[in-house]
C-alpha cells in the first residue's frame, strides 16, 4: 500500500502540488507570526520574575520546537528514501535539513540572548544546550555529506544513513531536562490539563508557533521545488513548464 502511494509522488506531481501550497503556507505564516508577535510584545503582561526579557520566548520556543520537528521530517523522509528510493523524498530530506539547521541556529542564538540577563552568561554547557548544538552539527554534516558527491543519488543515500543514525539525539534533547540537572525548566506549555504559563502569554506563543510552522512547511516545499528543477532540468516536463 505504502509503496504504491509513494510511487505516485512523481517529481512533476510534486512540483505542481508544492506550487499550490507554498503561497498559502507563507500567507498563513505572515498572519499568525504578525498577530502573535503583536500580542506577545504589546499586549501580554511582563513576567513577574523576568520582566520583558521573557518576550523572546515567542521566537525562541517555536524555533526550538521546529528544530526537532524538522529533524523528524528528515528522519521520516530518509527512511522512505532508503526503502523506496524516491527522488522527491531525497530532496525533501535535504530541504528539511537546511531549514532545520536554520531554526536550530535561531534557537541557540535567541537562547543565548535570553540566557545572558537570566543566567548572567551567553552560554553554559547545559545538557539541553549541548545536545541542541550537537543537533546543529548533525544538520550541517547531513548537508555537507549530501553535496560532497557528484552523483545526487549517492549523496542522498549517505545523507539518509547519517540522518537515521543521528535521530538518537532527538529524544536526548527532549528528555534532557528530566535526565540531567539542567538550567532549563521542564515543560510549561505541553501540559494541557494545567499549563504553568498564563493564558495571556500562552496564546501569543501558540500563534507564533503555528506561524513559524507554516513558514517551515513553505520553506521546505520551496527549497525542494527549486532543487527539483535543478535535478530534473533535462527532462521533458521541466521544458514544458
Task: Set out the residue ranges of the language-model regions.
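Polytopic transmembrane helical bundles with strong interfacial aromatic enrichment
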Residues: 1-241
Amino acid at each position: 500500500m505504502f509503496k504504491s502511494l509513494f510511487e505516485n509522488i512523481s517529481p512533476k506531481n510534486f512540483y505542481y502540488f508544492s506550487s499550490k501550497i507554498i503561497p498559502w503556507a507563507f500567507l498563513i505564516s505572515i498572519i499568525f507570526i504578525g498577530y502573535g508577535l503583536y500580542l506577545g510584545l504589546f499586549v501580554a503582561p511582563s513576567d513577574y520574575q523576568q520582566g520583558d526579557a521573557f518576550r523572546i520566548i515567542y521566537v525562541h520556543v517555536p524555533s526550538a520546537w521546529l528544530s526537532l520537528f524538522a529533524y523528524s521530517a528528515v528522519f521520516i523522509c530518509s527512511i522512505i528514501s532508503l526503502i523506496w528510493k524516491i527522488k522527491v523524498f531525497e530532496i525533501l530530506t535535504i530541504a528539511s535539513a537546511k531549514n532545520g539547521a536554520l531554526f536550530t541556529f535561531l534557537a541557540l542564538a535567541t537562547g543565548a540572548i535570553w540566557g545572558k540577563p537570566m543566567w548572567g552568561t551567553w552560554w553554559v554547557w547545559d545538557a539541553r544546550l549541548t545536545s541542541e548544538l550537537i543537533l546543529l552539527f548533525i544538520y550541517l554534516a547531513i548537508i555537507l555529506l549530501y553535496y560532497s558527491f557528484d552523483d545526487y543519488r549517492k549523496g542522498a543515500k549517505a545523507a539518509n544513513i547519517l540522518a537515521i543514525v543521528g535521530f538518537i539525539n532527538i529524544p536526548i534533547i527532549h528528555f534532557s531536562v528530566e535526565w540531567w540537572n539542567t538550567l532549563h525548566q521542564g515543560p510549561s506549555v505541553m501540559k494541557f490539563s494545567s499549563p504553568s504559563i498564563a493564558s495571556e502569554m500562552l496564546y501569543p506563543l501558540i500563534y507564533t508557533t503555528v506561524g513559524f510552522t507554516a513558514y517551515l512547511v513553505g520553506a521546505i516545499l520551496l527549497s525542494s521545488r527549486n532543487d527539483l528543477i535543478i535535478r530534473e532540468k533535462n527532462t521533458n516536463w521541466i521544458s514544458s513548464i
